[in-house]
Amino acid sequence: MIKLREFREFWEKVSEKIPELTDTLAVTVDENMARKITGLSLGSRVLFWLPPGMEGTGVHVDAFEEKHLCVVFVMEKYDPSRKECIDVLESTQETIDRVLREIIGSQWYGCSPIGLADLKISILPETKFFAGFAGWSLAFNAKG
């Protein structure tokens, strides 16, 4: 399995390289998460990451292969009465592209905790993640 500490540190490093990101937060379902999200100021552009899920397959015990579903979000908190959702999508598109380039670039170093299991990556617009947020999700499979 992917070590959560290494996974968190990877996203923190990615966030440090992209100045328009104001924070990096793990998405958990608890009261603290709700407080953190509602406490973010308007205009905050956050890299949210989900702890990865794991699926394993194999014909034999010695040929067991792990794949981890990884999902991150680049979301901006905005005031829907002052800004259109499409404007937020436009302004965050370059940021999600930079996150994608960091993921792909990290594969060259050989020590990334998220080695790509395949080159299938999905990026989708997100407008209902939380009220007052819009942006993009990025999903991919990583090797264990």
Residue ranges and their predicted role:
Residues F48-L50, H68, M75-D79, L116-K120:
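Alpha-helical context
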Residues M1-A63:
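Small/polar-rich, solvent-exposed N-terminal microdomains that initiate assembly or binding
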Residues W11-T22, R45, E90-K143:
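Acidic-leaning, charged glycine-interspersed low-complexity segments
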Residues A63-K67, M75-R101:
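Extracellular/virion structural assembly segments
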Residues F64-D79, G132-G144:
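Oligomerization/assembly interface segments of phage tail-like spikes and tubes
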Residues M1, R5, I86, E90, ...:
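Charge-dense, low-complexity intrinsically disordered segments
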